[in-house]
């Protein structure tokens, strides 16, 4: 675990009430997909835990749904602002247990941590299939990014 300030380089809405935020800073403590961060919001006492969607040497990406006062406040954060984060929380996924042809299943805001997991499994030369579920067509996110790296089946509860 590491506490530090990270600069917001992107915070954009990607689906109804769903936002993608990229934060620049030291990501070296992140060791596995599936880990999360705890973010301090200036006007709130408690930090908000958000799973890490993806990361590289210089930044990390989170995807969050604005459902309460805290996550709605995230939506008002502007590019260039600095946020206090605790990073590299949780154990993450142990890919040694996945076998050669893992099937990943997730829905809604459970989808983001699967993106980093899928990238790691592919880097390990595993054949990955993913099933993503969403309530409506308008709520689908990461579809374009997912198709670049994986075979994906996207389902939704309502009809097209």
Report the location of each language-model feature:
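Ferredoxin-reductase
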Residues: 2-81
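FNR/FR-type flavoprotein reductase catalytic core
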Residues: 69-160
């Amino acid at each position: 675990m590491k506490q530090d300030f990270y600069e917001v380089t992107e915070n954009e809405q990607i689906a109804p009430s769903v936002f993608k935020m990229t934060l620049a800073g030291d990501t070296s403590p992140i060791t596995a997909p599936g880990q999360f961060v705890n973010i301090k919001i200036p006007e709130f006492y408690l930090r908000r835990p958000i799973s890490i969607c993806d990361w590289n040497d210089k930044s990390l990406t989170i995807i969050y749904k604005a459902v309460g006062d805290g996550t709605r406040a995230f939506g008002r954060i502007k590019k260039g602002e600095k946020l206090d984060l605790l990073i590299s929380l949780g154990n993450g996924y142990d890919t040694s247990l996945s076998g050669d042809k893992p099937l990943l299943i997730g829905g809604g805001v459970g989808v983001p941590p699967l993106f980093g997991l899928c990238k790691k499994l592919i880097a390990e030369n595993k054949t990955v299939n993913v099933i993503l579920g969403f309530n409506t067509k308008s709520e689908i996110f990461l579809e374009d990014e997912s198709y670049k790296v994986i075979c994906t089946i996207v389902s939704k509860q309502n009809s097209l």
